[in-house]
């Protein structure tokens, strides 16, 4: 019964905070229900980061595609892997595609961006198994990879967006 904000988007928020910085502003737009559900099914978010960067994310759990997180990363054996990128982070000197970690460099619009060779560390463990193993290690006294304060910041952003979206009526046909 949960929405894709708390099930899926929360992980994108984690990645964005890690890669770009703290989120200081967010504006949400709710899409129309496709299944007739009361819960949020689809929407878009505009983010502002303390670094001055801005970003957008579209999300949906009613649009099967090759560009979802699990499909792209292959992390969940229950979801078909496509290994297609699902996130693109661009800046003034280049761009990075995720999860392929393809790096593009270019500062001049008159020149084509150059693909920069990178070597990403390959994890041989099934990520869900690695998460459970780490959880068990933490129970045994190991330091967690992510502390409670960091996780709380991501949760605060996700809950704020969920509340904003829940307060909106479905997007209808709007004349602009």
Where are each of the predicted segments found?
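NAD(P)-dinucleotide binding in Rossmann-like oxidoreductases
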Residues: 35-40, 51-130
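Acidic/polar loop patches that form or flank catalytic/metal-binding clefts of enzymes
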Residues: 22-28, 54-55, 95-99, 144-145
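A generic structural signal for residues located within well-ordered alpha-helices
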Residues: 8-11, 130, 149, 153
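C-terminal helix-rich "cap/oligomerization" subdomain common to oxidoreductases
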Residues: 50, 99, 134-176
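Hydrophobic/aromatic residues within well-ordered alpha-helical segments
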Residues: 19, 127-131, 154
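A general structural signal for well-ordered alpha-helical segments in protein cores
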Residues: 12-13, 129-133, 158
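Active-site rim elements
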Residues: 2-5, 119-122, 142-145
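Predominantly a Rossmann-like dinucleotide-binding segment in NAD(P)-dependent oxidoreductases
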Residues: 1-47, 69
């Amino acid at each position: 019964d949960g929405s894709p904000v708390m099930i899926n988007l929360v992980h994108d928020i984690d990645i964005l905070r890690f890669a770009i910085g703290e989120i200081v502003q967010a504006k949400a737009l709710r899409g129309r229900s496709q299944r007739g559900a009361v819960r949020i099914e689809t929407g878009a978010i505009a983010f502002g980061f303390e670094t001055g960067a801005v970003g957008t994310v579209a999300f949906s759990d009613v649009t099967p595609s090759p560009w979802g997180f699990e499909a792209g990363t292959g992390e969940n054996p229950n979801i078909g892997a496509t290994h297609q990128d699902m996130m693109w982070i661009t800046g003034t000197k280049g761009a990075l595609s995720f999860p392929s970690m393809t790096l593009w460099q270019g500062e001049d619009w008159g020149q084509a961006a150059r693909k920069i060779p990178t070597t990403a560390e390959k994890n041989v463990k099934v990520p869900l198994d690695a998460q459970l193993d780490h959880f068990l290690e933490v129970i045994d006294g190991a330091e967690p990879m992510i502390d409670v304060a960091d996780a709380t910041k991501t949760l605060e952003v996700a809950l704020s967006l969920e509340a904003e979206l829940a307060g909106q009526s479905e997007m209808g046909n709007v004349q602009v």
